[in-house]
Amino acid sequence: MLVSDVMTAFPAHIRLGATIRRAAELVSVSEVGQLMVLDHDSRFVGLVSEEDLVRAMLPRFEDVTAAGGTLADAFRTFLERGRTLADRVIDPLVVRDAATVRSTDELARAAVVMIDRGIRRLPVVDNGVLVGTLSRADLCRAVIYHS
C-alpha cells in the first residue's frame, strides 16, 4: 500500500511571510497541530506547529519575575507578548528540515519514520510540491479499512 492511498490531500497550509496572527487563526480553525509552509512559488519549505507558536509567545522567566512572579503575572505577560508578536512573520519559526515522504513511498516506510521520530503528521512532498499529509489517524484508517 502506498502513502497516496491513505494520505489527506489539500492539507492546511500557510505561506512564508504570513503573520503569527494568521498562523494562529489557521491552527485554531483547521484543528490540526501544524501548518505546512509554502514559499511564493507554492513549493514546500517546512512547517510551523501550534507548539512553535505558543513557545514564541511564552514569556521568559526574567520577564515573569520582573512583572511580579505570580501565575497571573505570567499569563498577562504571555498575552502581552502574543499581542506584540502577532503581526510579525512566521518565517523565523518555520522548521525547515522537516522529515517528508513521497506519495509513491510504501505506507510501511512512512509509518516507521513517523513512529521512530515521534511525528504525528508527515508532509507528503513530490518534487518539492506539497501534495498531502499523512497522519497517525490516516495510518489507523488504513488498518481498519484496508485489512
Give the location of each predicted region.
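Tandem CBS (Cystathionine beta-synthase) repeat/Bateman regulatory domains
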Residues: 1-147
